[in-house]
Amino acid sequence: MTQARYVVAALSLVALGVGPALAQGPADNMTFFVTSANPGDGGNLGGLSGADAHCESLAAAVGAGGKTWRAYLSTSTVDARSRIGAGPWYNVGGVMIASSVADLHSVNNKITPETALNEKGASPNYIGGPQPNQHDMLTGSNENGTASAMTCNNWTDGSANSMATLGHGDRLGRTEGVNSWNSVHPSQGCALENLAPTGGAGMFYCFSAD
C-alpha cells in the first residue's frame, strides 16, 4: 500500500470510529478528581452515601460514570483510606496520582497543584492562581488516612456548630514547604460561609474504588 493510500485508509477508519482517536474520551480512564463544586450545604453532604453520589454525578457529567466513585472522607466509624479501593489512581490527564493506598499516604504521592484537577480537567483556585483561594479540601482525616475527630458530624452538619479536618489540594499554605493534601488544619465551621475564610469552598477528593 502506498503512503497516500495508507493515510486515506487510516482516516477512513478514524471517521468510522474504528481508530484509537475516537475510542475514548480523556475522562474515560480518570479514577481521581477534585470536585468542581460543593453540593450546596457545606459540610452536610448527606453522609458518605450523599458524598459518593455527588462524586458519581460529577463524573457521569463528563463521561466517567459507571465506576464505583467514593469520596475521600472519614467518619467516626470509617477511615477514608479503607473505602477508596486499592489503586492505582489517575487524574483526567492520565497522570498517576498514586499506585496504591500506601503510596497515596506517603511522600511519594503525586498530588500537586498541576495534578489535583477537577473532573473537567481544570485546576481549582489554588495559591498563586485565581482568587478567592479555595485549596481547602474536606477530608475529616489524619495524614495516614484514618479518621480525625472533626467530620462535620459525619458529613451531616452544614452549620457553624461543627468542624472538619481539611487538607490542601495544592500542598501549599500554612507551613513552609510541602503541606499535607489531606490533613492540615480544622475549619472554622461546616457552613459554606465558615469554610471560605481559611481558603475553602467545600470541595473534596473523589476516587474510583474499582
List the predicted regions and their residue ranges.
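Bacterial N-terminal signal peptides that target proteins for export
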Residues: 1-8
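Secreted/extracellular ectodomain signature
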Residues: 22-210
